Amino acid sequence: MSTGPSEVIRIRMEAYDHAVLDQSARDIVDTVKATASIVHGPIPLPTRIERYTVLSSPFVNKKARQQYEIRTHKRLVDIVQASAKTIEALNKLSLPAGVDIKIKASAR
């Protein structure tokens, strides 16, 4: 069994484009595995879909509408037993501009 609480770094990523998000998650996992740390993920989280309906006609024709949607894809990566080498490698990692990253460290 474990000897005590271990620190877990939880990385949550969001993007509108799932291909860019998956590539970023793959880059993070490869970087963490190269530094001999334990990684769980990427775990796909539910996609948030925001739908907007607008009238396509400026005056009449209430039945004529257009629907638009924005999909926000999310992934979760957990890093267990992260060393200083792992954190330094993650800081040097360059990710695309369309990916929003939130990092949280906690003890398990």
UniProtKB/Swiss-Prot annotation:
It comes from Rhodopirellula baltica (strain DSM 10527 / NCIMB 13988 / SH1). This is Small ribosomal subunit protein uS10. GO terms for biological process: translation. Belongs to the universal ribosomal protein uS10 family. One of its GO terms (cellular component) is small ribosomal subunit. InterPro entries: Ribosomal_uS10 (IPR001848), Ribosomal_uS10_dom (IPR027486), Ribosomal_uS10_dom_sf (IPR036838). Gene3D superfamilies: Ribosomal protein S10 domain. Transmembrane segments: none annotated. The lineage of its organism: Bacteria, Pseudomonadati, Planctomycetota, Planctomycetia, Pirellulales. It comes from the Bacteria. GO terms for molecular function: structural constituent of ribosome; tRNA binding. Pfam families: Ribosomal_S10 (PF00338). The keyword tRNA-binding does not apply. Part of the 30S ribosomal subunit. Involved in the binding of tRNA to the ribosomes. SUPFAM superfamilies: Ribosomal protein S10. Disulfide bonds: none annotated. Keywords: Ribonucleoprotein, Ribosomal protein.
